[in-house]
Amino acid sequence: MLDKIWYRSKPNLLSRVLQPISLVFIDIANKRKIKQQLKQYKSKIPIIVVGNISVGGTGKTPVVRMLAQQYLAQGKKPAIISRGYGAKADNYPFEVTSGTLATQCGDEPAMLFDALQAQVPIVIAPERVQAVKYIEKNFPDTDIIISDDGLQHYKLARDKEIVVVDAIRMFGNKLCLPAGPLREPIERLKEVDQIIVIGNCSDKDKELLKNYKNVTYAKVVATEFVNILTAKKVAKTEFNHQNVIAIAGIGNPTKFFKTLEESAINITAKKVFKDHHKFTQSDFEGIDSDITVVMTYKDAIKCKNFAKANWWYLDIALDINV
């Protein structure tokens, strides 16, 4: 229901009714920001925060992965911190290792650890400052720390802020919660160092973005399919015009389905689960075992223990400045 009222070009009646509450939300958020900034922790290691000003999936984690890969290619030593949404670690800060389950560290950290082939330290903590201090102590030669989300975590000083925007949803009706999808007023964009817009942006929205500096356009591109059971990799054309069942338990499943369709794949059925869904074998009961199942990387991480031979995930990359 909220999606229907939030993602309109103009606020509807319900949004207008909720606006007074949004003003209270903004006031509380501003006071919290000021309070946190007064006791901000400043690390000697440069910190990049990759976040957003709206709720829901915008594509932050692919950006974090891309940045880490770029730094590795340059011979630098990056580290990643995350809140670890949904994590149930025994204690914090918690370092992700090869034996860590997604239930312990959260979906995104587990996926990033797998995608970066254990080359990058990943530490989670609800209080990100704890994660930074852990890296400072245990990985003192770290060149840069990338924070996956945390734009509004003002307890932590940052050297660069990157905001990720979904080109389709953009900023919705441009109102703050609960009248709209924004965590902070849209004017916050004037303070950040870079804005990365992912997807096909309309000319109208591009005009809006001219008001802000350092806007970069990117597109999610399919790179290859990876078998969840065997880790075998095949070209993205392998499933051209084949029938598949698409599974998604992410913040914005429409983006995933669109990427599949752009790869000339015939989706015979779509199964959508809530973001961060904890998959079990029972979720796949009733699915025709003869039809190929394709899901996101983030979902595949949680299905390894019961995956079938014809289950695959689609790996992606960002094509910048398309």
From Swiss-Prot:
It catalyses: a lipid A disaccharide + ATP = a lipid IVA + ADP + H(+). One of its GO terms (biological process) is lipid A biosynthetic process. InterPro entries: LpxK, P-loop_NTPase. ATP binds at residues 54-61. Pathway: Glycolipid biosynthesis; lipid IV(A) biosynthesis; lipid IV(A) from (3R)-3-hydroxytetradecanoyl-[acyl-carrier-protein] and UDP-N-acetyl-alpha-D-glucosamine: step 6/6. Its EC number is 2.7.1.130. One of its GO terms (molecular function) is ATP binding. Keywords: ATP-binding, Kinase, Lipid A biosynthesis, Lipid biosynthesis, Lipid metabolism, Nucleotide-binding, Transferase. One of its GO terms (cellular component) is plasma membrane. SUPFAM superfamilies: P-loop containing nucleoside triphosphate hydrolases. It holds the Pfam family LpxK. NCBIfam families: lpxK. Transfers the gamma-phosphate of ATP to the 4'-position of a tetraacyldisaccharide 1-phosphate intermediate (termed DS-1-P) to form tetraacyldisaccharide 1,4'-bis-phosphate (lipid IVA). This is Tetraacyldisaccharide 4'-kinase. It comes from Francisella tularensis subsp. novicida (strain U112). The gene is lpxK.
